[in-house]
């Protein structure tokens, strides 16, 4: 279980993330137990549903991508990514693990969290909890150390010109 003070610390870190025009377009809707948590768990695709419901907290992440007048907010998803990263860094500092998952039913996420579709875009879910064992995660990830496999820097950073 993650207590409310710890939950508040996570969202406090996210809330200080930089954003274009200080718009702060991120919306985090979380559940820890009860019927709402069951609804949140139901949006997970099978590969995530085998482990994520064991985490003490599940967060559904949305970005404001249209303003009140219906105009696009071009940086909404980028800024929300910065807020999620701030939350992840704070979780790590607190001895918690956080894992974002794109493997969710985005349409179901709106309903589960009660978020309006006209101005917000569903992005992902985040499981937050304590490190489990290899038995708690998908066997493919254990076998391939999938979670920590990274491209070479030369594949992602280029001086002056992109190279394929």
Regions found by a protein language model. Give the residues of each.
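Acidic, surface-exposed loops and disordered segments
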Residues: 1-164
């Amino acid at each position: 279980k993650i207590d409310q003070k710890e939950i508040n610390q996570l969202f406090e870190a996210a809330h200080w993330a930089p954003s274009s025009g200080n718009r702060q377009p991120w919306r985090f809707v979380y559940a820890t137990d009860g019927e709402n948590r069951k609804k949140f768990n139901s949006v997970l695709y099978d590969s995530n549903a085998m482990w994520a419901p064991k985490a003490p907290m599940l967060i559904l992440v949305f970005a404001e991508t249209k303003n009140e007048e219906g105009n696009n907010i071009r940086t909404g998803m980028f800024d929300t990514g910065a807020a999620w990263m701030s939350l992840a860094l704070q979780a790590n500092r607190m001895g918690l693990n956080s894992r974002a998952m794109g493997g969710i039913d985005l349409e179901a996420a709106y309903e589960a969290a009660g978020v309006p579709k006209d101005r917000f875009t569903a992005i992902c879910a985040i499981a937050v909890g304590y490190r489990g064992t290899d038995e708690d995660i998908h066997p493919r990830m254990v076998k391939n150390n999938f979670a920590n496999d990274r491209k070479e820097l030369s594949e992602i950073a280029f001086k002056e010109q992109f190279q394929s």
